[in-house]
């Protein structure tokens, strides 16, 4: 049986995830929460960039309509 997107997010709570946004930006952090619009709260987040050091951001909120995918 296939899972719904919010079921996957629920299973990923308190676990490390990688989030890719429209425009190609990627963030890695621990998923602390989400809502029905797929707005995400990441703790210990860092922005990942090719050929550059990652930038540590701490706790961030990611707007759901910018999310392309979440990889647990």
UniProtKB/Swiss-Prot annotation:
GO molecular function: RNA binding
The keyword Ribonucleoprotein belongs to this UniProt entry's keyword annotation: yes
Keyword vocabulary terms for this entry: Ribonucleoprotein
Pfam families, sorted: LSM
Keyword Ribonucleoprotein tagged: yes
GO cellular component, one term: ribonucleoprotein complex
Residue ranges occupied by any Sm domain in the UniProt entry: 4-72
InterPro entries: Lsm7/SmG-like, LSM_dom_sf, Sm, Sm_dom_euk/arc, snRNP_Sm-like_arc
Family note: Belongs to the snRNP Sm proteins family.
PANTHER family (UniProt xref): SMALL NUCLEAR RIBONUCLEOPROTEIN (PTHR10553), U6 SNRNA-ASSOCIATED SM-LIKE PROTEIN LSM7 (PTHR10553:SF5)
Name of protein: Putative snRNP Sm-like protein
Organism: Methanocella arvoryzae (strain DSM 22066 / NBRC 105507 / MRE50)
């Amino acid at each position: 049986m296939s899972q719904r997107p919010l079921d996957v997010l629920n299973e990923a709570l308190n676990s490390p995830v990688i989030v890719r946004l429209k425009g190609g930006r990627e963030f890695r952090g621990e998923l602390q929460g989400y809502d029905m619009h797929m707005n995400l709260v990441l703790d210990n987040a860092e922005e990942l960039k090719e050929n550059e050091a990652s930038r540590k951001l701490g706790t961030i909120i990611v707007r759901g309509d910018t999310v392309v995918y979440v990889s647990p």
